[in-house]
Amino acid sequence: MPSDNFIDKAFSAMSDVVMKVIPTDQKSKDAFKYYRSGMAAQVDGNYAKALGNYTEALALEEDPFDKSYILYNMGLIFANNGDHEKALDYYHQSLELNPNLVQALYNTGVILHYKGEQAEEAAELDEAERFFDLAADFWKRAIKIAPNNYSEVQNWLKTTGRVGVG
């Protein structure tokens, strides 16, 4: 998409200016460069390259808030590749550093809900309910932070009677 390309180029140009203007050490600048390269590779679908860049960024980054976004993006890659356990691990790590990272809360709920659906299909109803309840807990935390988002989730919580649970 041309508009996405324009946005990426504008973001890169602004990032370069910010990194030159704001006083920061070389390690932080390098971490940000790896993070930015990881984002570009992720957008292009080159997940191996993205993970490599994110790993380098994670090793250099000292700010817990920034680390949370690196970990979150790594989780996205694993989720996109169907490795839900690794995705959950990275989402949990990101939430340990940034408990209000609403995207990680939401995506954790998505994976847990999916696991609930799988358990339901396998007629493991107690296990399904456990996963659905866990998904509801994460989604309610996300909705508390962003109450105007996730209308489908809010409807699911209401229709399943999980609005007040947890």
Curated annotation (Swiss-Prot):
Role: Essential for the assembly of the photosystem I (PSI) complex. May act as a chaperone-like factor to guide the assembly of the PSI subunits.
GO biological process: photosynthesis
Keywords in alphabetical order: Membrane, Photosynthesis, Repeat, Thylakoid, TPR repeat
Localization (cell): Cellular thylakoid membrane
Lineage: Bacteria, Bacillati, Cyanobacteriota, Cyanophyceae, Acaryochloridales
TPR repeats: 31-64, 68-101, 116-149
Cross-referenced InterPro entries: PSI_Ycf3_assembly, TPR-like_helical_dom_sf, TPR_rpt, Ycf3/AcsC/BcsC/TPR_MFPF
SMART domains: TPR
Protein name from the UniProt record: Photosystem I assembly protein Ycf3
Domain of life per record: Bacteria
Membrane topology: Peripheral membrane protein
Similarity comment: Belongs to the Ycf3 family.
GO terms under cellular component: plasma membrane-derived thylakoid membrane
Chief location category: membrane
Gene3D superfamilies registered for this protein in UniProt: Tetratricopeptide repeat domain
Leader peptide range in chain numbering: none
HAMAP family: Ycf3 (MF_00439)
